[in-house]
Amino acid sequence: MKKMLGKLLITAGILVFFAVVVKDVFAAGLGFINGTEADSASASPRDIDSMVIESDSKDVRIIAEERSDISAGISGDSGKLFVTENKRKLELTVKEKEFQFLNGFNRSTLIVRLPYDYKGDLAVRTSSGDVSVAGNDHLALSGLNAVSASGNTSVTDVRIQDLKVKASSGDVSISNTVSKTAGIDLASGDANLVHVSGSLDVKMTSGDFNAVLKKVTGPVSVTLTSGDANVSLPQNGSFAVNALSASGDVSSPYSFADKGHKEQHHITGTQGSGRHPIDIKTDSGDLAIR
């Protein structure tokens, strides 16, 4: 009986081994990838208007710094980089190397270094990996679109005309960022915003929303299905707040110039001329306006 059990375990191990090998071989052989495989990439910001970064399971770090070129490379041994430059568009694709089950827990990261004078669009898509964009107070983009199936997203110290973040699972962190318009679409995870200025549209299914708004320059809409919201408003500005929880408490220690309505589940208030609407709603959760 023991010998038979041992043979079954050995057979199962062999089958798992070959299944992983076949998966890697088919992924490498059948996956069509645009671009040329390269150890690194470099381009002049004067020649590039838009960048597209795609990664399967690798983290992506984007760092702005004082430099003359756009540079990209992989840190670690488990990833492959493919590069395409065409019609003022730079595409960077990162894929898993074959037979990475032999590599243990070694995890690679795509590191992209942007010069401060790059002013174009940036799109980042990952199936499973974290995305971070660090502008170091000098990066100004016309657009940033980050999409992640599973992973955390972080954006810091950037000026952006249009910011879009979409994630199926993972936390979103945005700090010291100014945008004309910003949208967050999050299925599962928390969103934390600190010293953010601009217009905002947030849709979350399951997770908490925390925000410190530095300046409101357009409509702000926050809609949660299940989760708490804690929003800190600027002392100066012109906005009209409408906060509503279908099942939860709504509180506001904020001193509105005109507090129009206040009850357990619903608060309205106006600051200044009330030019910009701020609507915060949750189906299940507590709301706090500070």
From Swiss-Prot:
Disruption phenotype: Up-regulates expression of liaI which in turn induces the liaRS two-component regulatory system. Residues 276-290 have a biased composition (Basic and acidic residues). Induction: Induced, via the two-component regulatory system LiaS/LiaR, by antibiotics (vancomycin, bacitracin, nisin and ramoplanin), cationic antimicrobial peptides (human LL-37 and porcine PG-1), Triton X-100 and severe secretion stress. This is Protein LiaG. Residues 1-27 form the signal peptide. Keywords: Signal, Stress response. It comes from Bacillus subtilis (strain 168). The lineage of its organism: Bacteria, Bacillati, Bacillota, Bacilli, Bacillales. InterPro entries: Toastrack_DUF4097 (IPR025164). Residues 257-290 are annotated as: Disordered. It comes from the Bacteria.
